[in-house]
Structure formats: C-alpha cells, structure tokens
C-alpha cells in the first residue's frame, strides 16, 4: 500500500455465513481482555480472537477455542482474498472486534513490528451510518461486506461509533506468500 494512501477499497466479501454464525451462537465477548488491557486505545472494544498471537510473532497459527465454528468462513474469506488481491497468501490473524454504541477506538498508530510485515484489512459485519473510521485526515463510513485495506502502521487512525447499535468488524492480517515460504 502506498505510504500516502490511508484507505484502499479492495472489493466486497460475502459475510452472510459469518453473520449466521454470529446470530446462532452465544459468543463470549468478555473473557478475552488482553487487547483492551494492553492497549489503552482499545479499552472500549470487545474482542473475539479466532486466530491471534499475543506475542505478535505470527510464526505459527494460534487458534482459539471458537476457531472450529469459524474455520470454513475463514477459509472462504482467504480464497476470496486470493482472488481479489490476485496473490497467494494466508490470513495470519483474524478477530472479530465489537465497538459498542457511543464508544470509540482512540487515535493510534500500530507500531509493533508485525504491522509493517502484513497487510491489515477490515470487513464490517455489523455497522451503522454513524460509525466513522478515520485514518489520517480522511474519514469514512465503511459498509457491511466491504473489504478495506487500512494503512495502520503509517497513519494515526481511530473510530467513533456514534450510532445506537454495536459495530462488529473482522480485523485480519494478510501475509503474502513468497518463493521462500
């Protein structure tokens, strides 16, 4: 992604199967607090880690207890990404992040080393017209199913959910496969 670019719309991803899982399962949004407690900018969020590494090394795929119910959805999204991006790669982290109504993700830059090694994507699963994502000086209302690459390690970014409903995004990191992989 170009250093100056803040958002890059990549296409649309079908999130119907993920929404079905979301609606049919009682997901535990409260037990995983690492992200919220480690990074003050995420204090208002709730995270459901599915593929996640608290060391941020992402050298081996670490999956959570809920991975099996999401495995086919993640596999489908990975295949869609390969087609949309026209490149071979793999999802190395995948989480659902809930930003409750009237809450915010504070302005921050993803400064950890992994942020420059992988491409960060957001896909809204649930949202509303008053949820605004800002990267640098550019703000957008991201729509359900849109695939957005976010320049998270070069620009300050934040989110404010001014709506009356929660916002849930897939946040994932994509590793492009190289000949040495």
Segments and roles (model prediction):
Residues 124-144:
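A short beta-strand-loop-beta hairpin characteristic of the jelly-roll/cupin
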Residues 96-115:
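Conserved short histidine dyad/triad with adjacent acidic residue
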Residues 111, 124-125, 161:
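Non-cytosolic beta-sheet module surface loops
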Residues 119-124, 149, 164-180:
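A short hydrophobic beta-strand segment most commonly corresponding to one strand
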Residues 107-108, 131-133, 150-151, 155-163, ...:
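Short beta-strand His + acidic residue motifs that chelate non-heme Fe in jelly-roll/DSBH
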Residues 2-8, 118-120, 169:
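Intrinsic-disorder/low-complexity, polar/charged segments enriched in Ser/Thr/Lys/Arg/Asp/Glu/Gln
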Residues 1-87:
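Non-heme Fe(II)/2-oxoglutarate
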Residues 89-91, 100-102, 116-120, 126-128:
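Short connector loops at helix/strand junctions that flank enzyme active sites
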